[in-house]
Amino acid sequence: MRPLVSALCAFALLPAFAGVAGLDAVSRGADPTGQRDSAAVMQKALDELNRAGGGTLYLPPGKYRLEKPLYVEGGNSIRGAGSSAANWPANRPTILCVAFGRGDTNLVKNAAVKLRGGASLRDVAIWHPDQRFEDPVPYPASIWGDGHTSVVDVTLVNSWCGFYNNHCSSMLVRGFRGTALNMGIRAAYAFDVPRIEHVAFDPAYWAASGLPGSPKTPSAVRKLEMWAENNLIAIVAGEQDWGYWWDVFVDHAKGGIFLTVVPDDKGERMNPGNIAAGKVVMRNVQVGIEMKNVGYPGFLLTYGDIQARLCCMHYSKVPDYSKFHAVGIKPYYSWNAAVQVTGVKFSGAKTLFRSDKDKDGLIYCINFNDCTFSDWKDCAISQLRGSLVASNCRFSGKGAIHPGENLSQIVLSGNMFSGEAFAVKPSASTVVARDDREKGVVSLPYDIPEPKEREFKGKVFDVLDYGATPGKVDDIPVKDSSPAFAAALAAAGKAGGGTVFAPAGVYRIARGIKVPSGVELRGSFEAQHYGNSTHRGTQLYVYAGKGDPASAPLITLEPDAGVGGFTVYYPEQGVTDDSSADEALRVKRYPPTLRTAPRCQVRNMAIVNAWTAIDAITVRSDGLFVTDVTGGALDAGVIVGHGTTGGLFRDVHFNYTGWVGQGKYENHPRGDDWDKTTTCGMFADFTTRVTRGFVLCDAKEVKLHSCFCIMVAEGISLEKDPYTGGSFRGSTWGLAFDANTNGIVGHRGAEPKFVANCAMGVFSRQQGGYFVKTEPGFAGAIASVNSEIWSGRSRIVYLEGGRTILSQFLSWCCYEGVVKKGASLTVCGATFASNNGNDKGEKTTITYERGSSGAVCGSVDGRRFLKVVDETGGKLAWRNNGVRID
C-alpha cells in the first residue's frame, strides 16, 4: 500500500528549495494571506505526517496566522520558502504571524513552535504583529525545543525570546538572525555537542522588515535600540558540555553572552558548561561576555571584535547560591576554570577584561594570545587572583594591567605596550616574568565563509513509483528496494538531473546504488538528526556487502551529485572482534556507506553503525561539502585523500548513542560500556582499540569545522596516502575528542602540516591516552592553538617523531607528557591547572628525553607546579615562564 506521505506527494513538484515536502500547507487549507488562523490545519497536516512516519510540511511564501502553538514531533520538519523578512513583501518570505501570548511571561507553555527531539524548523520568519517597539511586553518563546532539535535559517522579526531549550542535547541553531527583545537564545543541559552557528541579533532586522508596526523613523529605531541596550541578553547558556559556537554577531544589547547555571526541568541540579566560541563580534553592548559560572576546564574564545561600554569580558565573583542551597539544590562551581582568548580585539569599555573572581586558594588562569586592547577608560585587564598570561598582544593606552594584590603569577611574552604596562605595581608576592622580545608563542588565523547548501533543480522522482517497498522499524520489508532506487536514479540522470525522493519508512537495500551527476538522492530529514533522537523518517536498512569491504559502496556519488536526509543502519553488524563470540556479536566488515566525488554534497545523514562511513579517498573529491552527518563507524568515520583539494566537513559528529541509545534497533549494544561482559562494554573495547574517527591523507585546503568523535582509538589519524604518497595540509576549528584513547596520531611515513584550532579532548579509554601521539618515522608538523584537555586518565603527548607545537594549550589536571628521541615539542603560552592527583606537584608535566628537542616559553602552572624534566643535554630552550619546580 502506498504510504500517506507519498500518496500526497503531488506536492513533490514544489520548487527545489522547498525540499521534497510531504504536504503543502496551503493545499491543506492554510491561509497565506494571514487573515485567518492557520494553526489548526497546519497541526492536522503535521499529525498526518507523523502518523505516516515523518516528513516535511512546506509553507509557500506568505503570512500564516497562528492563534495557538504548533507541535512538531521527531522525524518531522516545517520548512518555508525563505526567512529574510527585509523589505517585505518584495522578497516573498514565509512568515509565521504569532497572534497569541501577549503579556504571557511563561516562556515554555505556549511557545509558538514546539520542537521535539529529531524535529526541525527552517527557512521561515517569525513575527509577533501585536508587539510594540514603543513599549515591548513579554511573550512566550517563539521556538521551544527539547533534545536534538534543529533550527536553521530562521529570522526573528520581533521576538521576546527567540529560542528556548532547557534540555538541548546536541541541538543545532544555524542561520538564526533577527531582533530579540529580552533573550535571543536560552539553552542549557546539552551534551556532545550543542552548536550555535551564524547567528545575529540586531534591532535593524525589525526596522528593515517594513512589516506593519515596525519602527520606520530614525528616532523610532533609536528607541528600539535603547530598549535592547537595557534589556536584551543575546545568548544565555547554562550547562553546554562541549558547546561549539561560531560566528556570533550582536549589536545593541545589555549583554551579548551570559554564561551561568540554571535549574534543570526537575529542579534537581544547576551545572555550568564548557564552551568554545569563535568569530564573535559585538557592538553597542554594556557587557560583551558575562561569565558568572564557567564549567571546567574553561571557556575558549577565538577570533572576534568586542566593543562595549562597561566591560568586554567580565569574569564575575563567586555568585551567592544560598537561596538554592536552602531548597536542596547545590549549584556546581568550578573554582579553577580558565579563560583563554585568541585573536580578539577589545575596545571602548571602562575595563576591557575584568576578573572579580576572588577567594583563597583560587588557581585559575586568564590567558590572552594575539589580542588587541585599545580605547579603555580605566585599564585593559583587571584581575584579582589566579595567574595571568598575555602573549603577542597589543596594548594602546596607559596603565594596561591592574594586578590584584593576590595575583599569583604574571607571564608577559612578546607584547607591545604604548604606555606603562601596569596601572599599579604588582605586589611583592606576585611572580612576574616579562620579556617583550619573546616571540615564540604561536598564533594562527582561521576562518571559513558561511557555506550554502546546494539545492538540486529539476523534476522529483519518487522511488515508490519505481517499485520501492517501505516498511516500519518493527516490520522490515522482505523485498529489496535497491533496484527501485537504481531505476529512479537512472531516470533522473537521463533527465539531466533532479531529486530522487524516498518518503519516510524502512527500506531494505541489498545492493549498492549510484547517484548520477546533477542528481540528489533525498530522504525525509531536512536537518541534522541522530539515530537515537527518532526512529521515524527515511531509513535504509543495509544488507549489501557484508564481509566484502571491497565490493560496491552502499551509495556511490558521481561528480556534482548529492545525498541527504537518511538514517542508515546495518542490522547484522556486531560489537566485538573476539573470535570466540557468537557470530551475531562479531563485527562485520562492509564496503563504505558513501563514496564521494568532486563537488559532491552530503547532508543531513545519520550513519549509525557502518564499517567505514565516508570514503573520500578512493576517488579524488575536490570541492566536496559534507555537513550535518552523525552516527558512528567501526573502522573509520571519514577517510579523505588522493590529492583532494578544497572542501569542507562541517558538523560531522560521530557518537555511538545513535545505535546504543535507539531501543528500536534490535541489535543495539546494551549495558555498561566499562563492563566487557556486556555488549556495550565489548563494543566500547573494540572501538577504542580499532576505530579511527577522521583519517587524513593527501588533501589540501580541506577544512574540518566543529567535528566530534567519541570512544575511538584515534580521533585524527594522519597517514601517508596509499594512492599518492602525500600527506594532509590543512586546518581545523572545533575538533572534539570525548572518551577516546588518543586524539591526534601521526603515523610512520606521513609528513603532514596539520593545525587544530580550539580543540577539546578527554583521553580516558584503554588505560588512558594522549592528546597528540606520533610514531617513529613520522616527519610532519602538528600544531594546536587554544585547545584544552582534561580528565585524570588523559595525558598530554607521547612523541616519537616529527614536530609538535602546543600554543596556548590548557591542560586541566593532565600531565606526563613524553618527548622521545627524534621528536620535538614546543609548548608556548600554555596554562597548566594542576589539580586532581597532583596536589603537591608530584607528577611530571613533561619529560624531554635524551635525543629530543624543543622549547617551553611563556607558560604557567596555576599552582606553581610546572615540572619539566630536561634530559636533552642542552636542546631544550626554557624562556620566560612561570614558577618551575624540580
Question: Residues of each region from the PLM?
Answer:
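Extracellular "leader-to-stem" segments immediately downstream of a signal peptide or signal-anchor
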Residues: 1-134, 150-152, 197-226, 367-369, ...
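Short, T/G/N/S-enriched strand-turn elements that build extracellular solenoid repeat scaffolds
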Residues: 46-50, 65-74, 111, 115, ...
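Right-handed parallel beta-helix
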Residues: 47-50, 112, 117-128, 131-158, 160-162, 169-226, 230-233, ...
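Parallel beta-helix/beta-solenoid repeats that form elongated, surface-exposed shafts/blades used
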Residues: 789, 797, 848, 858, ...
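Residues that act as N-cap/strand-start positions at coil-to-secondary-structure junctions
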Residues: 64, 107, 135-137, 157, ...
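Short, solvent-exposed loop/turn segments at secondary-structure boundaries
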Residues: 35-38, 138, 166, 474-479, ...
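Short beta-alpha connecting loops at secondary-structure transitions
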Residues: 107, 325, 353, 547-548, ...
